[in-house]
Amino acid sequence: TKDMMNEMGAAFAVTWLVFGYTVWTGDAMMSETELVGIGMGGGLMAVAALAVVWMAFAGAHILPPVTWMHMMTGELDDTDAWMANGLKLAMQIVGGGLALVTMAQLNPDGVTYDESMTEMVDGVATVMAMDAYSFDEMRLLGGIAAGAILWCIHSKTDNPWAMSIGVIAMASYIGAEGSTDMASMLMNKMGDLVPTLLAYLEAGLAVGLGAMLAMKIDENLD
């Protein structure tokens, strides 16, 4: 549908413009790396790029935390809404994946998944697995708090610039790059499926719970 294509296009754009793609500055594994793109730490440029994408793709959630907030603050027994939002999450992953594939074709010196996971073990370059998922209570609480703040920004301002500032400021707490991380993992043999998926779900649920909490508090204050 048009909404799903809009979501995919928005995810493609934000992955390309903001998240970027890491490349080698020289020979692979022998040189430094640099980011082609603005990056989430790009300050005002990142805020501006994200705001422009939100305005250009009006109606798209673009980022997983925004979709999770809508899921958890809507009617929880509305299966149609859950399916629609689930499709949005899927299209965000597809859009991010398409952007990664395109950037890889345009940047032959890009860092591959295996290269990014390679470490020297006894003098031998060894591809390592991602660390196993471990539950962190403070990380969960941080996600809930960030979700509550982000929902207040989203519901009270309805302003892409305000949302962009909130997302960039709290990116590490809300799993802003979750869809691109999922896309990267799925396109690379799914070797780190479990830790990547669990981190993605934890961040989404934490942000969603935070948004629900903020909504309930706001309702009780009226």
Describe the role of every protein-language-model region.
Residues 1-222:
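Membrane-interface helix-loop junctions and terminal tails of multi-pass membrane proteins
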